[in-house]
Each structure stands twice: as structure tokens, then as C-alpha cells.
A protein has these predicted regions:
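Bacterial Sec-dependent N-terminal signal peptides
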Residues: 1-35
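Extracytoplasmic loops and strand-loop junctions of Gram-negative outer membrane beta-barrel proteins
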Residues: 35, 69-73, 169-174, 218-221, ...
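Outer-membrane beta-barrel domain signature
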Residues: 40, 75-78, 116-119, 175-179, ...
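Outer-membrane beta-barrel translocator domains and adjoining extracellular loop/strand segments
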Residues: 63-70, 111-123, 155-161, 211-218, ...
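Strand-connecting loop/turn motifs
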Residues: 46-48, 95-97, 137-139, 194-196, ...
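Outer membrane beta-barrel
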Residues: 37-64, 76-209, 230-246, 320, ...
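Detector for outer-membrane/organellar transmembrane beta-barrel domains
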Residues: 44, 243-398, 406, 443-447, ...
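Predominantly the C-terminal beta-signal and adjacent terminal strand-loop region
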Residues: 222-226, 417-456
Length: 457
């Protein structure tokens, strides 16, 4: 086993070295890019159409959960290469008060990816919406279509190209790939900015769980998403902006402005859907339960020195997540494994192999992150600067019987050209859980190390 780990580490080091040579060469070309791919539609530059390309490539070493198998072979650890996100965004102000937005792409493509046995990527439209401005400014916009616009949290509708941490706190995308399409829903919304208030109200038509592409979860004594009733979902998000107003072009919310804006917000959000969940009572009668999600949060992006262009970034959020009795869901981002032979895992909560952990559940969650942006060109004019960060997620879920799902991340972004060209290094420590005589107990902690290269234009 030790020899295997040594060989794997040697392969990882050599792989990282080769990739960095390519990254540095390509990043120099990106750093020379000054203009957006933006096309003006009139002489007065009042209307436009813009295209953005983005790719996030991961190199990852993961310490596997107990019993993990890859292609039928037990693996105590894995090293994989994958495309976390590959996206094309197309949007524009096509008339003085008319806006349209499309996003096309794919996610989580690695060597164990399979679409019904087919490794070929299945890209799809993430967003397709039309929006009309009823005011002269941003006071009121009405939109509809397939959209990320929703309630709960800024991280429920994140701009993935501006993330500070390696990835977003996915638990905030509370129904992802259950009754939505990768966190997007068919919705009608109103959003706007009135004085210092940024608001959005959303009515969504959730997808039925039967269209997930696989078999639906069987009903049990623990709550799961209902395969029968499908009521409309109501969402609200309200944010009070103490300093500068945040960008309002699309419904997405920025991860970090890298000190280019002075932002301090306090916000609250909610999602409600009647009878979204179901379970059995005494293994016989069916009981429907409401989906109730609530969050209060604060976001800070504060420049410190105009000449140095250094800044601090911070976020803190408190979530109350009620999916019904004992709801729990494991999830692992771009899971490097595809099976398990473990016998003592929590059942009925999704795949517990690879890098997964209890990410969603009925209970309460505290999430916080903090980062510091060093001065501009810290490493030299052509090598950019650094942005170290740390984040913590503490989930107290009902089904874990008092055990805490605590996840810690520390990392650093090497900003070669802001968000357009950056290399991120991230270390994660996550919990594992076992089931003994129907009692949930904590297993050993597992770790993961990721290098990501993000390029966008």
C-alpha cells in the first residue's frame, strides 16, 4: 500500500509540473487580452450582444471514503483529471429595455463520467431567459425562462467565474439535480434595485423527480422529494447594500470583486414549496411535507489601499433547511469513484463513496469564508498576485443524530490576470460517517487536494 501511494505521489508531482508549463504559456496569451467579446448593435452603443467562454480544469488527489471502488476495483485514494465546468455565455441588451441571456455547457466530466453508459459529454442549456425592464433604471425587471434566479442565498445563484474559494458551497443550491436542472428552474421573476435594497421574487415550476434520468428514490420513513404532487415553488431574496450597489446585468451574484467595488450587504432569503417532500408513517400511510428553506447572510468585499489594490473578502451565512423528517443527501463534486462495497454506510441518502459527504439535510448550517487579496503585481508585472482564503461549513443535520458534518477548506488563488486567468490550490478536510446498530457514528476524516486552472474570455 505504501509503495502504491509513493508511486501515485510521484505521478502527481510530474503531472503538475507538466501542466504548469502549459498553464504559464497559455496564461501569458490571456493576460494580453484587453477587450470583451462584445458587439455593439447600434452607433450610440446603447444595445449590445456579448459572448463569454469559461473553462475550469481540475487535477485532484482524493483520499477515498471507506469501501470506495473505481471500475469495480477497491481504491483507498485516487488521482484524476477533469473538467469541473465548461461554459459558453451569450447575452445582451438587444433593445433599450429588452435583455436576453443564454448559458450552454457541461459539468463534472472526468474518467468515470457516464451518461447511460456513454462517455460522450452531454452539454445542455443551463439558462435561457428573456427579461424586460419596466423602469428607466434597475428598479424593476420582469423576466422568465430557464434561470438561476431564486431565493435563499447569493450562493444559490453564484457567478461561477468569480468564485473566491475553489468551489461554491453547493449545499446552498438546495434542490440541485432533484427538482431543477443543475440549480436552474423554469421561472417567472421580478428583480430590481430600489435605493439600497436589492430584491428578487420568483415563482418556479419545478421539474418532477421522475425526469432525473434514473430511478426515483423509493418512499421510506425518511423524507425524500415527492414523485406525486408538484406544486409551484415561491422564492424571495432581499439584500440591503450599505456601500456600492452590486452589478445587476444578469441574475447571477458575484463571488468576489477583487477589491474593485466597496460592498457590504446584509441579506435574507427563503424558498417554500407545498408538499414537495413525502415519507411513510409506520411504513404504511403516505405523509406529504413542505419544503422550507431560510437564510440570513452578510457579504463583504472591501478595498484597503487604492494604490496597492489590496482587499479583504468575507462572508457568513446561517441556514435553516427543512426538507422534512430525517432528510439527508450525500454528494461529492465530480465524484472520482463509481461504486462501493461498504456495508456500514447510511442508507437511502445517495452514494457515500469517493469524495462525498452529507451535504444536504434537514437541520441547520453555518457557512463562512474569508480571503485576503495581496497588492497588485505582488509576484511581478507578468505574474500577478495571490489571494489566500479559508472556508468552513458546519452542518447539524437531524439524521446524523447529533454528529456534525464539518468541512474545512484552505487555499490560495494565483491571479495571473484576475478571474480571466487564475490557478487555484485547495486542501479540504471532510468528515465520514458509519452506521452501527442503527446508530450514526463518526469515522475518520478524509482529505482532498485540488489544483484548478480557470481560463475565461
Amino acid at each position: 500500500m505504501q509503495e502504491k501511494v509513493y508511486i501515485m505521489r510521484s505521478v502527481i508531482i510530474k503531472s503538475f509540473s507538466l501542466v504548469f508549463l502549459g498553464i504559464l504559456t497559455f496564461s501569458n496569451q490571456l493576460m494580453a487580452q484587453k477587450n470583451d467579446l462584445k458587439f455593439w448593435l447600434d452607433e450610440n452603443k446603447g444595445t449590445y450582444f456579448q459572448v463569454i467562454f469559461l473553462n475550469q480544469t481540475w487535477l485532484r488527489f482524493n483520499e477515498s471514503n471507506s469501501g470506495t471502488k473505481v471500475n469495480g476495483v477497491p481504491e483507498s485514494s485516487t488521482f484524476d483529471i477533469g473538467l469541473r465546468r465548461t461554459r459558453i455565455q451569450m447575452f445582451g441588451q438587444i433593445a433599450p429595455k429588452a435583455f436576453m441571456y443564454f448559458q450552454f455547457g457541461e459539468n463534472n466530466f472526468n474518467a468515470v463520467y457516464s451518461n447511460n453508459g456513454n462517455r460522450k459529454i452531454a452539454p445542455f442549456f443551463h439558462d435561457a431567459l428573456c427579461e424586460y425592464k419596466l423602469s428607466n433604471g434597475n428598479q424593476l425587471k420582469i423576466g422568465g425562462g430557464l434561470t438561476i434566479a431564486n431565493g435563499l442565498s447569493r450562493f444559490s445563484q453564484p457567478s461561477i467565474g468569480t468564485i473566491m474559494t475553489m468551489d461554491v458551497p453547493v449545499f446552498a443550491q438546495a434542490t440541485v439535480e432533484k427538482i431543477d436542472q443543475f440549480a436552474r428552474k423554469l421561472s417567472l421573476y421580478a428583480r430590481g434595485q430600489v435605493s439600497k435594497l436589492d430584491y428578487r421574487f420568483v415563482v418556479s415550476d419545478p421539474f418532477p423527480v421522475s425526469t432525473l434520468g434514473g430511478s426515483a428514490e423509493p418512499i421510506s420513513d425518511n423524507s425524500s422529494f415527492s414523485a406525486q404532487k408538484r406544486n409551484k415553488q415561491f422564492q424571495t431574496y432581499l439584500s440591503w447594500q450599505f456601500f456600492e450597489k452590486e452589478g445587476h446585468t444578469t441574475p447571477y451574484m458575484t463571488g468576489t470583486y477583487l477589491g474593485k467595488k466597496k460592498v457590504l450587504n446584509v441579506a435574507a432569503g427563503m424558498i417554500f414549496q407545498k408538499d414537495a417532500m413525502w415519507r411513510t408513517v409506520n411504513s404504511a400511510d403516505t405523509l406529504f411535507e413542505n419544503l422550507n428553506l431560510f437564510c440570513v447572510e452578510s457579504f463583504l468585499d472591501l478595498p484597503l489601499n487604492k494604490e496597492k489594490k489590496n482587499a479583504i473578502m468575507a462572508y457568513a451565512g446561517y441556514f435553516i433547511t427543512d426538507y422534512g423528517k430525517n432528510y439527508l443527501r450525500y454528494n461529492g463534486l465530480m465524484n472520482p469513484a463509481d461504486g462501493s462495497n461498504a456495508q456500514n454506510v447510511i442508507t437511502g441518502a445517495g452514494p457515500a463513496y469517493g469524495n462525498s459527504y452529507p451535504m444536504f439535510g434537514t437541520g441547520k448550517v453555518i457557512y463562512s469564508q474569508f480571503g485576503y487579496l495581496f497588492r497588485n503585481n505582488l509576484l511581478g508585472e507578468d505574474l500577478g498576485t495571490l489571494q489566500p482564503y479559508a472556508s468552513v461549513t458546519v452542518g447539524n443535520y437531524e439524521r446524523l443524530q447529533g454528529n456534525i458534518s464539518d468541512v474545512y477548506n484552505v487555499g490560495v488563488n494565483w491571479l495571473l490576470n484576475g478571474h480571466n486567468a487564475k490557478i487555484s490550490f485547495d486542501f479540504q478536510s471532510r468528515p465520514s460517517f458509519l452506521l452501527e446498530n442503527n446508530d450514526v457514528i463518526k469515522g475518520g476524516r478524509k482529505s482532498c487536494f485540488i489544483v484548478q486552472f480557470q481560463a475565461s474570455i
